[in-house]
């Protein structure tokens, strides 16, 4: 039982790490209301993601 709980804790920490990496461009590139979406795409691709979009003036990597 303790092993199962330990595995679940480790898995949740790994998932949290992936989510944090996915948003690695949020602080680097704030999106303007109009345009500048290419900067977000480039930032996410340089960080190793497939691309990104602007949501609520923040860059979200996919």
From Swiss-Prot:
High-level lineage: Eukaryota, Metazoa, Ecdysozoa, Arthropoda, Chelicerata
Subcellular location per the Swiss-Prot or TrEMBL entry: Secreted
Pfam families xref list: Toxin_17 (PF08086)
Assigned GO CC terms: extracellular region
GO molecular function: potassium channel inhibitor activity; toxin activity
Residues with site note (May represent the binding site): 33
Functional note: Blocks human and rat Kv11.1/KCNH2/ERG1 and Kv11.3/KCNH7/ERG3, as well as rat (but not human) Kv11.2/KCNH6/ERG2 by binding to channel outer vestibule (S5P domain) with a 1:1 stoichiometry. Inhibition data are the following: hERG1 (reversible, IC(50)~7 nM), rERG1 (reversible, Kd=6.8 nM), rERG2 (irreversible, Kd=2.8 nM), hERG3 (irreversible, Kd=4.05 nM) and rERG3 (reversible, Kd=38.1 nM) potassium channels. The toxin potency is not affected by elevating potassium ion concentration from 2 to 98 mM. This toxin only blocks channels in a closed state.
Domain notes: The presence of a 'disulfide through disulfide knot' structurally defines this protein as a knottin.
Name of this protein: Potassium channel toxin gamma-KTx 1.1
Disulphide bonds in the chain: 25-43, 31-54, 40-59, 44-61
Signal peptide boundaries: 1-20
Taxonomic superkingdom: Eukaryota
Source organism of this protein record: Centruroides noxius
Site positions for Key residue on the interacting surface with the channel: 55
Keywords: Disulfide bond, Ion channel impairing toxin, Knottin, Neurotoxin, Potassium channel impairing toxin, Secreted, Signal, Toxin, Voltage-gated potassium channel impairing toxin
